Amino acid sequence: MECALLCLCALRAAGPGPPWGPAGLGRLAKALQLCCFCCASVAVALASDSGSSGGSGLNDDYVFVVPVEVDSGGSYISHDILHHRKRRSAHGASNSLHYRVSAFGQDLHLELKPSAILSSHFRVQVLGKDGASETREPEVPQCLYQGFIRNDSSSSVAVSTCAGLSGLIRTRDNEFLISPLPQLLAQEHNYSSPAGHHPHVLYKRTAEKRVRWYQDYPGSQRTYPGHSPSHTPPASQSQEPEYSHRRWQKRHFCGRRKKYAPKPPAEDAYLRFDEYGGTGRPRRSAGKSQNGLNVETLVVADAKMVEKHGKDDVTTYILTVMNMVSSLFKDGTIGSDINIVVVSLILLEEEPEGLLINHHADQSLNSFCQWQSALVGKNGKRHDHAILLTGFDICSWKNEPCDTLGFAPISGMCSKYRSCTINEDTGLGLAFTIAHESGHNFGMVHDGEGNPCRKAEGNIMSPTLTGNNGVFSWSSCSRQYLKKFLSTPQAGCLVDEPKQTGQYKYPDKLPGQIYDADMQCKWQFGAKAKLCSLGVMKDICKSLWCHRVGHRCETKFMPAAEGTACGLSMWCRQGQCVKLGELGPRPIHGQWSAWSKWSECSRTCGGGVKFQERHCSNPKPQYGGKYCPGSSRIYKLCNINPCPENSLDFRAQQCAEYNNKPFRGWLYRWKPYTKVEEEDRCKLYCKAENFEFFFAMSGKVKDGTPCSPHRNDVCIDGICELVGCDHELGSKAVSDACGVCKGDNSTCKFYKGLYLSQHKANEYYPVVTIPAGARSIEIQELQLSSSYLAVRSLSQKYYLTGGWSIDWPGDFTFAGTTFEYQRSFNRPERLYAPGPTNETLVFEILTQGKNPGIAWKYALPKVMNVTQPATKRYHHTWRTVQSDCSVTCGGGYISIKAICLRDQHTQVNSSFCSVRTKPATEPKICNAFSCPAYWLPGEWSACSKSCAGGQQSRKIRCVQKKPFQKEEAVLHSLCPVSTPTQVQVCNSHACPPEWSPSPWSQCSKTCGRGVRRREVLCKSPAAETLPESLCSSSPRPEAQEGCVLGRCPKNNRLQWIASAWSECSATCGLGVRKRELKCVEKTLQGKLITFPERRCRNIKKPSLELEEACNQRTCPVYSMAVASWYSSPWQQCTVTCGGGVQTRSVHCMQQGRPSSSCLLHQKPPVLRACNTNFCPAPEKKDDPSCVDFFSWCHLVPQHGVCNHKFYGKQCCRSCTRKS
């Protein structure tokens, strides 16, 4: 199982002792693991007046609007915006609704349709006292809608029209919430509207709490179904988030261990073998489904949750949250089409019998998973997934409030007992918790833990709940985990075609429009919390800062909800505070790049794997576009030739790679361990030789590793893929009893018999002698007995159970094949080998009592059966068969094939017919006449524009193919009248925003090297300035560069000076010595300082010789002309400190000439270390621009968020010191 923990520790800047930081996470176990979803909460002491309620800045986060219903053309219909399906029918057959909202200087045309989130059989069931059950038609679902904003196809809308408009509106880069205007808020602003109008408040997530405060204010008259949270989470006690798994009942912790370790709970009674295979549903592959995958979801709200929001309003609230969850799973970055379908909602007024819910998340989830496993619909069908929403402040390891947000089993989806999660109600952020926990149920683990994805990239599966500038998406690792899970049989429950959904809809507004920033703070920090009023309004789109009694502003580093107001006519969209209602580019759906070349084969023999891959980058999905459908890789087998006989098994090679790597401080010799569960066949399990333990050394074996010794199937990317006897991936071809691929046993002769003789105990007795070349050998006892099967050769060499020594069951390789020896306490003994054998074998029985009877059988190819007299002589003759012509015109060939027939009608192997009488099979010419002329189009030219609609053209030719010739151009009149298209429109999608640099400024210096700057803005095609995040897909042009207007006056102290001569290049005879010119400056003290040569480029170099000959002593002359090594002087060291290298040349010389007669072991060294003294530490110069802008910056490195865009820049000095 996996728990999602949100660390709520309020860290006071002036508090004593070091604050607790977000803890690290342990490893993930194989089946049931617990995952920690952690985020540090920073509390900063700010000067605040206790009476502050948010300040005037809140006006920038919300506006008052009056929505009106319009028709599809935008024409006014009515101010009455309360809609149910019955009402809609009056306007026509269309199910769509249209509203217009004017806000922030723009008209938003909302186009809505009934939401497909709910099943047509969706019902709300209320479980009351004494188990009383009430099932009713829900009032809310008839007014739930989803849709988009007209002229902004990257937008999404999810609203309820039950009592005005309430919900979420998402544009390209902003998120808004909308809800009916609370009366108290209207009174504060002295606002009133004409009779018949229904005023609403449109606000960002930053204003959610403020609007919500007015909605929940005692005595406040609400004009929409509100949610009045009475739950105040207790202050965090700096508790460590916990990470644990249950596979072997061991405990691990997220972060540092507490002073005491909680006792692990007892074994879960319900954690039994999963029953996802017994649902009766078709087990098609979910990963290869061409349609969307549907997660039929049961949602259960406990009594505290129902009490918190009210029985009448909780349904609307839950469906609003689930609608947000649905949109997160429809995000293009997930890479699959996942539909969340709510089939039932159960509201608990009291806990039913058998269900225990309290603060203890682990125990509560155990109880809930077991309880929901017994729930079955009236039609006998079960839900695929169950979600428990609780009003308890849950804790993963004790029955007290702490920092846990959710809990879920990893890879539990579709399991009867493990497809379930528990999630703590925290407001609209609950949607992210549900998506995160359900992601674990889909087999996803945290980013950055055992995978290459980074922890703090703002993805849904990040261990810390921190968005990428307020935007959450799915990482590439999450896509891979999901893809792997969907390829398993377990995911088959998701392939069900969804039944037509009913009339139930989701709220059609952004969450931040329905619930303002104050309400979001109240959900996160308690009923008395509200938005912090001290200058953090513009940053709430990245992190929502809240203020509660105690004069502290604090955050959980979670962004305000999409659509939360962040300023005057501004709202939060995708983590940016942007202009309200700003329209963005259309979604760009991802398209695949071209396939790459085939990779290298993973093996040199024995059947490896190679692949081609492509990337979803042509273009990549943007602005809400869909991820590319299909697979990013295709595989095929390669190098299928057998490996040499004595070569090491491929799996054994991989285990042997760990022989020289210490394992827990010791070296072992490893060999493969294959007695594992079927789903673990593609993991690398190795056993230490001479020790009784094995370990999973790798999560997956190398591609091309056989899944098991006796099958053709191979492992690819950790998944066992089917391979037929024809060595084709995905092939179901099998060999017959005689090893003929796709054979029908027609070439086999079968032998079988029964051995029933009784003998004296404790002796060996022959059962059957099977000759070499036998295949499909099977020897089996008829009943359980105390006797044992044995095998030996004709020369009395025992291969199995010889010398009265009983072998354990397993695989035994001898006689050219592998025998599978099965012996169980409740089944008779059995021996099986596919063959063929390369020697004659004698199968015996070592009697230990009565012989129950032994059945044996084997097969021999008929051509080998020379000892058996033929019962019938067959007549074999050749016959020719011919194919159709290879072409219909232009000259082709008919291929002719000779086949061997038995008695003129049965085709058999060609070896039965005589080669001497085989007829000729030369191909025949056919259809040797010219083809009709046709148009041959050329390649399309490049598009004239990359976006906004361009043109491309191509040339066409009229060609004709004559017999056995290439096509040649002919008159256009010979071709058909209609011609292929020669010009077409291309790249019709809207142009994305792009960087727009302004002209360069003047150079900062009048001479020498200076700097010039320019402003670089992100602009739309209409030259409107947009947030920089919208242009992040392309490199940002440089805003600063170096410049030189002219050379500065000369430095009179610079001059060229020649260095000293080097040593002579030869120790005897004629050599060469060199020197070089250096650019130096002479100081007042007379010292010379060397500069790069470019500093003296304006000074004329002196005319000096830099190389001259040098004569050393005469080389000795040897009478016997012995070859010797001669070395040059050592060159200058490569560095002055810290350890460098000196080199020299060494030559073998004989009588002054190069020679190869020197002894190699006497050759002097050509390289040596030099200047190994330590270098002095460089002086650090502080960057004057690297400063802290806030007094609480010292907390940022303590909580590990220096890589956060906002906190890293604003607290540069603290982060630099920490590093």
Swiss-Prot record:
Its cofactor is Zn(2+). It holds the Pfam family Reprolysin. Residues 1182-1219 form the PLAC domain. The active site is at residue 437. One of its GO terms (cellular component) is extracellular region. Disulfide bonds join 369-420, 395-402, 414-493, 453-477, 521-546, 532-553, 541-572, 566-577, 601-638, 605-643, 616-628. Binds 1 zinc ion per subunit. Residues 589-644, 931-990, 991-1049, 1052-1116, 1121-1176 form the TSP type-1 domain. One of its GO terms (molecular function) is metal ion binding. Residues 218-241 have a biased composition (Polar residues). Residues 1-47 form the signal peptide. Zn(2+) binds at residues 436, 440, 446. The keyword Disulfide bond applies. It comes from the Eukaryota. This is A disintegrin and metalloproteinase with thrombospondin motifs 18. It comes from Mus musculus.
